[in-house]
Amino acid sequence: GTQLTMRVRHAGGIVGLDVTQGLPRVEELFESRTPRVLSPIAEIAGKVEVTETEEGYKVVVKNTAIKPPEEREYMIPLTSELKVKDGDLIAAGDQLSSGYLDLKEVLLVRGLRGTQKYLIIEIQRVYESQGIQISDKHFEVIVRKMSDKVRIDTPGDTMLLPGELVDRMRFQEENARVLAEGGEPATAQVAILGITR
């Protein structure tokens, strides 16, 4: 009986230790911080060209399906592991190398839903690596709360101020009121905020 209890405690201690190693990543995600090891994401869809230079990997994404053709270039350190190879066809928002994504970039390229999905996948990855199963719905509530504010770009005829952070509902209500009066609505960008803000 005593030995069994010792084993359970010991195993519990090991699991606890492993979870704490993943907590900085979860905290980074919940606080919407820029990761230390960043991976660029493709801003456009297209075909990949990879060239190895002394400075690093030069990854060029070309979209020739549109006129005029679009091209984006990314320099990736040789120490990073590429997630794309020469000749690959990729979508806008695809990760180009190992590392983590900057939420601001993900928001610009993948939009709000894509950013919310990325957050949930990344948070689940940390917990699942420790053998902990948590339903997505718990994280969905947190992620929804992190993304329920907008930052005002132009106030139009509303009572809102440029740069002000407001709830999305208040923004929509204020715009509806102004539009009903024939005025100019405000414009805003979605803001992903850390849970302590």
Report the location of each language-model feature.
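Intrinsically disordered, low-complexity regulatory segments
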Residues: 2-197
